[in-house]
Amino acid sequence: KLILLGAPGAGKGTQAEILCRELSIPTISTGNILRAAIKNGTPTGLKAKSYMDAGQLVPDDVIIGIVTERLAEDDCKNGYILDGVPRTIAQAAALEKAGITFDDVISIEISDETIMERMSGRRVCESCGASYHMVAVPPKQEGVCDKCGGKLVQRKDDAPETVKARL
């Protein structure tokens, strides 16, 4: 049971992907859960959308609710990697109160300049969620996902002005 901490764009998702393959445990990414809820038009998704589009943090009660639900699923019984939570002291306290435990914390530290470079080049597939970087990990064909052929887009929360606000 691990928690990955770091600013948006620090590489938590990338490292979580590697660790989950090696350890055979799921990665629980609050960002991915929220984006799926938005795509599916759930009440939680609609509530979160306005915050995310503005580059603001989604309220703690919403985050803790979705994380608690997800961690109750069978694939988390043997461990998990939390990516993006807790982000605040209040979230950490709420996780503890909910009986959610962890064994280790990994904090990823990089400069704001590097974060800006990474996020400005990040593209995500609208269909399958695969992630690319236009310089470091580009798709074979610009704007097209290698995995499913879907359209690659820049997330609204990766726009430079939004990234600055999130830092």
Model regions and ranges:
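Glycine-rich phosphate-binding loop of ATP-dependent small-molecule kinases
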Residues: 1-167
